[in-house]
Amino acid sequence: MANEPKKILIIEDDYFLSSLMKARLEKEGFAVGQAFDGEEALQLLKQEIPALVILDLIMPKVTGFEVLQMISITPQLDKIPVVIVSNLAQDSDIEKARQLGAREYFIKVKISIDDLIEKIKTLAA
């Protein structure tokens, strides 16, 4: 149905940050799923394709880079916009994420939740 909320998948091992983003996105009218490591994320992506993924890069089991690579090489997933939210601030990490298909890259210590939400609204439209 056209009125169903768009689904966002947050892949973040920091429970507090994940819950904060989830609450804010739900307030904006999105349906939100959460995965707390890369392995769980890959399982969820097999079950349901979200409109957008918010992805941390430093996670246990399967890293965010590995998840991003899997998304980029999987035909059913490769069109999903991926927004990185990470502590990795080196240009080489940002470039690697972009080469693997990340649409946006936010550094956690510099992030404005309002800027993040506005970018998500644009990319998930």
Where are each of the predicted segments found?
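Conserved acidic carboxylate
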Residues: 12
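Helix N-cap/capping motif at the beta->alpha junctions
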Residues: 34-43, 64
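Active-site beta3 strand of CheY-like receiver
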Residues: 48-54
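Active-site residues of response regulator receiver
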Residues: 56, 86
